[in-house]
Amino acid sequence: MSAKDKTKKRILSAALELLKEHGYQGTTTRLIADKAGCNEVTLFRHFGNKQTILEKVVEGQTFGPDLKGSIDQSIVWDLEADLYKIAKGYLDFMRSIEDFVMLGFKEFYKIEELNDEISKGPVEFKHYLTQYFEKMKDRELIIPIDCEQLALQFIWMNFGYFISKARFGDRVTALPDEAFLKGSVQLFVRGISP
């Protein structure tokens, strides 16, 4: 990694940490530069402005090649086994960016320009799942059904559990992750199996 790339990475890491701590309004370019160990001129040379930094932070926190790759490697075309692995991978990924997701609900919705960037991850995951369900339908391993709708229902089920746990801890349910994942996947599979 070049020195320029290392500097960019430090700036983005500092920005994310400060955004979690102070929110968008409270995170100044001066604070970001200080935390990253550079001056504001360097920050502006790399990113131009605070908005661009925020956009790059968002890009780094969405469904990407790592999650897709780990799921792809574990697909065996067994509906229950695959959906369990997908749900587990999704929950683990969402937990890894939990602070960012909660910050998004608290702060980022106010910044209209970010909505397209923020929605890229969920849209990409929806497309990925839709393609998986289409292949399962082609193999006649699920009932004839609208696969995009199926993907959305699967995502919402898992996202709802994640948000409930992230926001309320065990107040809504003390159900362990493993019990939720197994139970919800079994129910889902029962509903779409031929």
Label each region the model flagged.
Residues 1-22, 27-38, 52:
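Basic, helix-initiating cap at the start of DNA-binding domains
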Residues 18, 132, 187-194:
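C-terminal alpha-helix
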Residues 24-25, 114, 142:
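Conserved hydrophobic residue
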Residues 38-47:
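Short hydrophobic/aromatic patch on the recognition helix
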Residues 47, 105-111:
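Short helix-capping/turn signature of helix-turn-helix
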Residues 55-86, 133-134:
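Amphipathic alpha-helical linker/stalk segments
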Residues 58-59, 81-106, 155-159:
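Helical hydrophobic small-molecule/effector-binding pocket
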Residues 92-96, 113-139, 149-152, 163, ...:
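Amphipathic alpha-helical packing segments from all-alpha helical-bundle domains
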